[in-house]
From Swiss-Prot:
<dbReference type="GO" id="GO:0000256">
    <property type="term" value="P:allantoin catabolic process"/>
</dbReference>
<protein>
    <recommendedName>
        <fullName>Probable inactive allantoicase</fullName>
    </recommendedName>
</protein>
<dbReference type="InterPro" id="IPR005164">
    <property type="entry name" value="Allantoicase"/>
</dbReference>
<dbReference type="InterPro" id="IPR015908">
    <property type="entry name" value="Allantoicase_dom"/>
</dbReference>
<dbReference type="InterPro" id="IPR008979">
    <property type="entry name" value="Galactose-bd-like_sf"/>
</dbReference>
<comment type="similarity">
    <text>Belongs to the allantoicase family.</text>
</comment>
<dbReference type="GO" id="GO:0004037">
    <property type="term" value="F:allantoicase activity"/>
</dbReference>
<comment type="function">
    <text>The function of this enzyme is unclear as allantoicase activity is not known to exist in mammals.</text>
</comment>
<dbReference type="Pfam" id="PF03561">
    <property type="entry name" value="Allantoicase"/>
</dbReference>
Length: 391
């Protein structure tokens, strides 16, 4: 997962120089491209961040806020198409900053042809980014040819990071900066009165098993924000065991032998009080019905069932949402009718029948550390359901 991408909320806060191409290009979600004959009033158009040839002391650098904050596993410094003008050396620093203590950073606006102003330097200096931890020391880069354009760096750190400083020495161009890792929420800052999405990928939720992902991975459905298209969801192949002629049961649910499923490890153990299943964009290929179950697994148990391809005794799974009819291109909200809490779970399984696509899954509730502080009575599994039309 690219934690810095603009598609998940990554943002450039500052760059020393953006003369040929702005730093915002670094965090585009698409791959860089090259337009041989395209120029701007400042020079050759390049799909990346490119600074002017430096003629003053120092080096160029930029600061970005991660869209998904958490543990960084590695970087890809992509200099594709920068062959005679790539940055020859790079280093990367990081910090874990509290959002409410950040100084006010001026909005960047249109940057091509410009350098940072004294006011912008003064504002960014309050972050003391010179002192941030080094995740990648100064390292030489390879040119942006097809065989050498991607420069990969592994990171051995378990710390949570919120901001990145990318240093280039002394100047030049970089096409993309990919920051790979896993989300990690600061649960100590969670409002105990407000439910959180315990499966969100931004907080550390992750898919740990699935039956089929022909047209889209289940990790997509726990992504940041709403789905952008059908490609931004989980979609399976059509099951081949469907009967030649389909029939419904007395509740209008299709009578079919097969199903597809995906299992998610929650970002934090907790109880689920609100479920949202969104089939936006899936109009001719939404599932007929679904159900959601939960269980508690230790790390060792999870590793074992992954090896067994999620063959888990049925009694381990506890129902969170019974078999429920779904509608195409629709957001389905399921609210508990009671204030009593359900059992704490670590994993959730979404089952769809017989096949099809889902754009988003939200499992809102309370992390277990907060649940223990709340009164607990006999759990109930009654749900109310509402539908929210997608535009």
């Amino acid at each position: 997962m690219d934690m810095a991408s603009e598609s998940v909320g990554g943002k450039i806060l500052f760059a020393t120089d953006d003369f040929f191409a702005p730093a915002e290009n670094l965090i585009k979600s698409d791959s860089p491209c090259f337009k041989e004959h395209e120029y701007t009033e400042f020079g050759k158009w390049m799909d990346g961040w490119e600074t002017r040839r430096k003629r003053i002391p120092g080096h160029d650098w930029c600061v970005l806020r991660l869209g998904i904050q958490g543990v960084i596993r590695g970087f890809d410094v992509d200099v594709s198409y920068f062959t005679g003008d790539y940055a020859p050396r790079v280093s990367i620093q990081a910090a874990n900053l509290e959002e409410d203590k950040l100084p006010e950073i001026p909005e960047r606006g249109t940057r091509t042809g410009a350098a940072a102003t004294p006011e912008e330097f003064e504002a960014i200096a309050e972050l003391k980014s010179d002192d941030w931890s080094y995740l990648v020391p100064m390292t030489e880069l390879k040119p942006g040819n097809p065989a050498s354009g991607h420069n990969y760096f592994l990171v051995n750190s378990q710390q949570r990071w919120t901001h990145i400083r990318l240093n280039i020495f002394p100047d030049g161009g970089i096409a993309r900066l990919r920051v790979f890792g896993t989300g990690q929420k600061d649960w100590t800052a969670t409002d105990p009165k407000e439910p959180a999405d315990l499966v969100a990928i931004a907080f550390g939720g992750v898919c740990v098993g699935f039956s089929n992902a022909k047209f889209g991975h289940p990790n997509n459905i726990i992504g940041v924000g709403g789905a952008k298209s059908m490609a931004d969801g989980w979609e399976t192949a059509r099951r081949l065991d469907r009967p030649p002629i389909l029939e419904n049961d007395e509740n209008g649910i299709l009578l079919v032998p097969g199903c597809e499923w995906a299992v998610f490890r929650l970002a934090h153990p907790g109880v689920i009080t609100r479920i949202e299943i969104d089939t936006k964009y899936f109009e001719g290929n939404a599932p007929d019905s679904c159900k959601v179950d939960g269980c508690i697994l230790t790390t060792q148990e999870e590793e074992a069932v992954i090896r067994q391809k999620w063959i888990l005794p049925a009694h381990k799974w506890k129902p969170l949402l019974p078999v429920t009819k779904l509608s195409p291109n629709q957001s389905h909200l399921f609210d508990s009718l009671t204030l009593e809490l359900q059992d704490v779970i670590t994993h959730a399984r979404l089952t769809i029948v017989p096949d099809g696509g889902v754009s988003r899954l939200r499992l809102r509730g309370f992390p277990s550390s907060i649940c223990l502080l709340r009164p607990r009575e006999k759990p109930m599994l009654k749900f109310s359901v509402s539908f929210k039309a997608n535009p």
